[in-house]
């Protein structure tokens, strides 16, 4: 007995080629524009309490560039992850 192969093109969808991401090297990255270093903020600074947050805000405002008066409600929850 012979084999009979029948191909239905209407039922087989061609798989789209995956999009290749363009590789970026250092020569494609420009210098920062309008960058102003105002403060160092570490994770310990924010966990030390609201006084620290307000002092960081005051320090950043004293450096300039923060002319608008914006207020924000900040809620922090401290979770103790130490066992025992």
Swiss-Prot record:
UniProt keyword annotation of Transmembrane present: no
Topology of this chain in the membrane: Lipid-anchor
Name of the protein: CDC42 small effector protein 2-A
UniProt KW keywords: Cell membrane, Cell shape, Cytoplasm, Cytoskeleton, Lipoprotein, Membrane, Palmitate
PROSITE patterns in alphabetical order: CRIB
Lipid attachment locations (S-palmitoyl cysteine): 10-11
One GO CC term on file: cytoplasm
InterPro entries according to UniProt: CRIB_dom, CRIB_dom_sf, SPEC
Domain of life: Eukaryota
Annotated TM spans: none
Gene Ontology biological process terms from the UniProt entry: regulation of cell shape; regulation of Rho protein signal transduction; regulation of signal transduction
Ranges where the CRIB domain occurs: 29-42
Statement: the UniProt record of this protein carries the keyword Lipoprotein: yes
Cell compartment(s), UniProt: Cytoplasm, Cytoskeleton; Cell membrane
Gene3D superfamilies: CRIB domain
GO molecular function term, any single one: small GTPase binding
Main location, first listed in the record: cytoplasm
Family: Belongs to the CDC42SE/SPEC family.
Function: Probably involved in the organization of the actin cytoskeleton by acting downstream of CDC42, inducing actin filament assembly.
């Amino acid at each position: 007995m012979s084999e009979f192969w029948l191909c239905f093109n209407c039922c087989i969808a061609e798989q789209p080629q995956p999009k290749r991401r363009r590789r970026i090297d250092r020569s494609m990255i420009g210098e920062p524009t309008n960058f102003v270093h105002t403060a160092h903020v570490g994770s310990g600074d924010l966990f030390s309490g609201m006084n620290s947050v307000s002092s960081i805000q005051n320090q950043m405002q004293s450096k300039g560039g923060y002319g608008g008066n914006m207020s924000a409600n900040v809620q922090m929850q401290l979770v103790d992850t130490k066992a025992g």
